[in-house]
Amino acid sequence: MHELSVTQGLVDMLVEEAEKRKVKKVTKVTVVIGELTGIESESVKFYFDILTENTVAEGAELVFKIVRAQFKCTQCGNVFERSNFTFKCPVCGGQGVLIDKRGKEFYIESIEVE
């Protein structure tokens, strides 16, 4: 359910930026979502369509880029993406892993306007 508040923030930001720049129409928004955020793109799309009604972003295409999480083995230092729902290091078999650099992203990558 947190997708509603996340999407409301996204729409508020779009409308605010559009007003600042005197944009008449937002046509496309690209959003990056890390797989560890727990944010479901389908829910964001659902709320986006509702929340943008009667705004400059109404009818805008919403595109998602999903970023796979990256983990670092605490035993050998190998950086890897999780596969088959296991967090075992594919190099040494170690099970102690830390979240590395990717997977927690949530941001607007680009906005296309008329």
From Swiss-Prot:
GO molecular function: nickel cation binding; zinc ion binding
Amino acids binding Ni(2+): H2
Keyword Zinc: yes
GO term, biological process aspect, one: protein maturation
Gene3D superfamilies: 3.30.2320.80
This protein's UniProt keywords: Metal-binding, Nickel, Zinc
Keyword Metal-binding annotated: yes
Pfam family, one: HypA
Residues involved in Zn(2+) binding: C73, C76, C89, C92
UniProt cross-references to InterPro entries, sorted A to Z: HypA/HybF (IPR000688)
Protein family: Belongs to the HypA/HybF family.
Function: Involved in the maturation of [NiFe] hydrogenases. Required for nickel insertion into the metal center of the hydrogenase.
UniProt protein name: Hydrogenase maturation factor HypA
Native organism: Caldanaerobacter subterraneus subsp. tengcongensis (strain DSM 15242 / JCM 11007 / NBRC 100824 / MB4)
Source species taxonomy: Bacteria, Bacillati, Bacillota, Clostridia, Thermoanaerobacterales
